[in-house]
Amino acid sequence: MRNLQLSIEREVERAIEGVNLKDTRRCYRDQSEFVVLERFLTQPVVDQLLYEVDLLTPDVNRNYIPGHKKGGSVSFYALQNQAPAILSLYRSPAWLMFLSRLVDAPLMLCPEDDPHSCALYYYTQPGDHIGFHYDTSYYKGRRYTVLIGLVERSEHCRLVARVRKRGETEEIRETRIPMDPGTAVLFNGDTLWHAVTPLGKGEERVVLTLQYVTDQEMGP
């Protein structure tokens, strides 16, 4: 486990070295706390994560809420027992510092009893999707979402983000984002109106979701 943590940490540091922090922060601010880092993670990290995606497939819990979402997921509780690479990425000191610098706030892990703090989402059946929503935070501070693409074998299933330019109320564009393996998307869950379009027949998509907060206490 220790060797795996060190390996993940080294690869995360390598990935961060390839990012122009100044330009990325500017893009994040200009897009009202939203930015895409295409193919950010290195292949060794992606390979480790994909191994755990396959390992956890039998634990996928399918759910369907008419008019809102359909798909499968593996919660943080299952990841704690079977996904050391995913946990190493989620808890990576270098990763946490990098994200904190991007959002200009000291970020923390979610409490251990939050099942959504780190989870896998499997889109494997035709029509799997999530309707437009905010990742509303019930913490006292802000909560930030990071999406990591792992499996992207779809021409139809896309993250759709309605991005507003900072300081403007008028919507500037609707962005459709393919979550290629290693691509990372960072945003403030309370400010980004987003969805996932329906999966087509014979397609597959798997995304890792990581949540970070500025205050670990729940609000009233």
Per-region residue spans from a language model:
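Generic structural "secondary-structure junction" signal
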Residues: 43, 78-81, 91, 122, ...
